[in-house]
């Protein structure tokens, strides 16, 4: 889609509104990079994911992503053998707590809950539930 069409459709304003609702800096950065899709299969998949997310939100409420910090710099420092500071360790701990909370949100509470296309994403989360902060 060309820039003139995007401007006419007020796409930048829509992206700005979406970014304002992001609950983490990483989420806001992701929102700013969104471009319109043109592949029909990808569009259909995204619509299915959106419908599944909406259904989960209606049933369970909006999940909290508070404590979702970018820790990639800390992980790079660890890879080269550096020690982490206390604030870095706390951020990693908070991220692990958030992971546990989101993994729990993704569980099906009872037999009535049907599997959906988002399950694969929740299954990939590996919280370390034995860590306490």
Stretches with model-predicted labels:
Residues 1-131:
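Conserved amphipathic alpha-helical "coupling/scaffold" segments
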